[in-house]
């Protein structure tokens, strides 16, 4: 049976039809399977805690190589929340370095900062996959991101043309994030938008997951 892959969620499940990647903060206990990172929202703590950056990076490094952790993130830049851009960019770059050192993909949080994300990608030339979660922008921006090797994960709200582009280029992921929707229902909705059978969508994303991390094969 081909499972449903939920690449980014804040809801843990024991459903055997679903393989979900639970997002955890750097200071939370890891579970299998999970992503661990320093969310841009948390960077605001650096404004009042001079040790926040060094401490959070150290804690993330300690967890990053664990078998339960299959990705680093959420990491990224948020122009509306968190610390100033200089602090956010420093913490983002440090997390990119960690992802590269442990050879694991990066889950990206991006709010009104696509140009900055692309700039970091071009400057650092990372070898590990980058997945931008919660993608809602248009096809033109999707084409720009995919052109720079950034994959896209779609929640409940998405641009259909961007979705189709991501599917056709094998850069598509699906997620529930903080939403209460069942990932199976989400797959059904997306398959309908793509005008394909849901089993075809499941198989495509599962094959991508198997290439992303062998951990998906061990579940």
PLM segments and residue spans:
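Mid-domain alpha/beta scaffold segments of enzyme catalytic cores
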Residues: 1-219
């Amino acid at each position: 049976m081909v499972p449903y892959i939920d690449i980014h969620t804040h809801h843990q499940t024991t459903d055997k039809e679903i393989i979900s990647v639970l997002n955890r903060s750097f200071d939370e206990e890891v579970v299998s399977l999970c992503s661990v990172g320093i969310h841009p929202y948390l960077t605001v703590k650096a404004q009042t805690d001079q040790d926040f950056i060094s401490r959070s990076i150290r804690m993330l490094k300690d967890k990053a190589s664990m078998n339960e952790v299959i990705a680093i993130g959420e990491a990224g830049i948020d122009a509306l929340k968190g610390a100033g851009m200089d602090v956010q960019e420093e913490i983002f770059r440090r997390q990119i370095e960690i992802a590269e050192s442990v050879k694991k993909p990066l889950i990206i949080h991006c709010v009104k900062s696509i140009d900055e994300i692309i700039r970091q990608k071009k400057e650092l030339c990372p070898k590990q996959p980058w997945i931008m979660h919660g993608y809602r922008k248009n096809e033109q921006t999707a084409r720009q991101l995919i052109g720079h090797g950034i994959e896209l994960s779609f929640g409940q709200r998405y641009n259909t043309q961007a979705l189709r582009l991501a599917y056709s280029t094998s850069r598509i992921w699906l997620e529930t994030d903080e939403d209460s929707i069942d990932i199976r229902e989400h797959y059904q909705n997306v398959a309908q938008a793509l005008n394909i059978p849901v089993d075809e969508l499941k198989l495509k994303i599962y094959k991508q997951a198997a290439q992303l991390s062998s951990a998906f094969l061990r579940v």
